[in-house]
UniProtKB/Swiss-Prot annotation:
It catalyses: L-threonine + hydrogencarbonate + ATP = L-threonylcarbamoyladenylate + diphosphate + H2O. Residues 1-56 form a transit peptide. It is a peripheral membrane protein. GO terms for molecular function: double-stranded RNA binding; L-threonylcarbamoyladenylate synthase; nucleotidyltransferase activity; tRNA binding. Cytoplasmic and mitochondrial threonylcarbamoyl-AMP synthase required for the formation of a threonylcarbamoyl group on adenosine at position 37 (t(6)A37) in tRNAs that read codons beginning with adenine. Catalyzes the conversion of L-threonine, HCO(3)(-)/CO(2) and ATP to give threonylcarbamoyl-AMP (TC-AMP) as the acyladenylate intermediate, with the release of diphosphate. Participates in t(6)A37 formation in cytoplasmic and mitochondrial tRNAs. May regulate the activity of some transporters. The gene is Yrdc. The modification Phosphoserine is found at residue 61. Keywords: Cell membrane, Cytoplasm, Membrane, Mitochondrion, Phosphoprotein, Transferase, Transit peptide. PANTHER family: SUA5, THREONYLCARBAMOYL-AMP SYNTHASE. It comes from Rattus norvegicus (Rat). This is Threonylcarbamoyl-AMP synthase.
Length: 280
């Protein structure tokens, strides 16, 4: 495991930033994927591992070895209570074990983020949602939206760490449409807390180079290449966040990058009604 101290304090000027952004190279819907650039220079602190392109990863290929190495390294760091930077289907994110209270506190300190703002929970399978949430929608609805660039907010179960978002009975669930993140969540075997890899109030990150200020304070950075076109504002919107905690209704908490498709499924296929005050 890396000897980096992921919970070391940021410089005072860095720690002052406060704000909200959604956490998290793979299939990015609506954004053009670019070829990965040359590897970024390593900074003191974080270990950087470059992912092979997912299309090249086959059972006995050299690329599979690199993919497996990155998975094992990330799981080891997460189980040790560290914070790891990861690519998702929307943005680069910071992940930690949702069951490790010290790691959760570390994420807030790293980002300069108010602890009144919740972290999402990343899972690897739709079946896992039922363990951590009180689900009041058909399973088919979950399967239509997951994996994908959405965060579904539901009532949390007693299985989740009480130090995770203790101020709310709800939790946002992510199952990213990204091969590495699906493998990581399944191999880790528990809930991952996930947020965007940026200082609060700053722009979200589409490449590892865009959050280099955080590298020295992380144990591991997984470089999956650019997620989308850095010149496109749409590619920085993050996931579409939907409240499904009220039976028969949905509320759009954040429009995100998949609003049109998400609302079409919720209303057109399942007949859910927009809740009062929804930004849809």
């Amino acid at each position: 495991m890396s000897t980096a101290r992921p919970c070391a304090g940021l410089r005072a000027a860095v720690a002052a930033g406060m704000g909200l952004s959604d956490g998290p190279a793979g299939s990015s819907r609506g954004c053009r994927l670019l070829r990965p650039p040359a590897p970024a220079p390593a900074l003191p602190g974080a270990r950087l591992l470059r992912l092979p392109e997912s299309e090249a990863v086959e059972a006995a290929s050299p690329e599979r070895s690199g993919w497996t190495e990155a998975l094992r390294a990330a799981v080891a760091e997460l189980r040790a209570g560290a914070v790891v930077a990861v690519p998702t289907d929307t943005l680069y994110g910071l992940a930690c074990s949702a069951s490790c209270s010290a790691a959760l506190s570390c994420v807030y300190r790293l980002k300069g983020r108010s602890e009144a703002k919740p972290l999402a929970v990343c899972l690897g399978r739709v079946a896992d949602v039922y363990r951590y949430c009180q689900v009041r929608v058909p399973r088919e609805l979950l399967e239509d939206l997951f994996p994908g660039p959405v965060t579904l907010v539901m009532e949390r179960s007693e299985e989740l760490n009480k130090d995770l978002n203790p101020f709310t009975p709800l939790v946002g669930i992510r199952i990213p449409d990204h091969a590495f993140m699906l493998d990581l969540a399944q191999m880790f075997g528990g809930p991952l807390a996930l947020t965007s890899a940026n200082l609060s109030s700053q722009a979200s990150s589409l490449s590892v180079e865009e959050f280099q200020d955080l590298w020295p304070h992380l144990s591991l950075v997984i470089d999956g290449g650019p997620i989308g076109d850095s010149e496109s504002p749409e590619c920085r919107l993050g996931s579409t966040v939907v409240d499904l905690s009220v039976p028969g209704k949905f509320g759009i908490i954040r429009s995100g990058c998949a609003l049109e498709n998400t609302t079409a499924i919720l209303q057109g296929k399942y007949g859910l009604l927009p809740s009062q005050g929804s930004c849809s």
